[in-house]
């Protein structure tokens, strides 16, 4: 059996999706955010370096503007996200302050990491914030990102963004929180005998083909984007855990080596019992 070894992990990127932050009613899950802030603050107190990639701007914006569903018009989507981003960061700042942890905001577009000069600048910004003991909270800059073919500003979703951030910050581990328990051998919502994959060492075509489907009603990322993110992590010689974000305290259990979720780590680097 493959044993998870995280004793040497210092820098961690945690990605939380909209479905983990927003209740099915559309209201903000305050308890979940408080638990997440507690866990991250606890890790910081233990000497870990944590970067949070947080979706949720659209969900927060819909709640504030009392809109029941995501608008289809691009300009309105950007407006809703812009309103929601301010509210989300305000709440994060308040809740993290309760645990005496300071946070900052970094909004990225894909062109920032494509061009060497801007990539160097944002990398230096991450390093400076981390050196100050601050938790950078990262999101895509939805108010200016566009999804057209002649533009290079949009990542696509925050699953991919979290993999990019893990790469440019040379993180030891990416923990992706979602509304699913991990990667299954088949769709668990359709097949009762679906089995959770505890460890994935290679992203095969079979895995890619089985990872169909879109994201939640408030978010954009589905299983395919998570698999693509894991592939990006592999290309950077990193590792990732995909796990259910229902209880953020499970992050601490994962770091203790407990086999929760799916661990993505290339086979040549895996240590055996």
UniProtKB/Swiss-Prot annotation:
ATP binds at residues 15, 178-179, 220-226. SUPFAM superfamilies: Carbamate kinase-like. It is an enzyme of class 2 (transferase). Its EC number is 2.7.2.11. GO terms for cellular component: cytosol. Keywords: Amino-acid biosynthesis, ATP-binding, Cytoplasm, Kinase, Nucleotide-binding, Proline biosynthesis, Transferase. Gene3D superfamilies: Acetylglutamate kinase-like. GO terms for biological process: L-proline biosynthetic process. The keyword Amino-acid biosynthesis applies. The keyword Oxidoreductase does not apply. Transmembrane segments: none annotated. One of its GO terms (molecular function) is glutamate 5-kinase activity. It is found in: Cytoplasm. Pathway: Amino-acid biosynthesis; L-proline biosynthesis; L-glutamate 5-semialdehyde from L-glutamate: step 1/2. Substrate binds at residues 55, 142, 158. It catalyses: L-glutamate + ATP = L-glutamyl 5-phosphate + ADP. NCBIfam families: proB (TIGR01027). Catalyzes the transfer of a phosphate group to glutamate to form L-glutamate 5-phosphate. Belongs to the glutamate 5-kinase family. This is Glutamate 5-kinase. It comes from Streptococcus pyogenes serotype M3 (strain ATCC BAA-595 / MGAS315). The gene is proB.
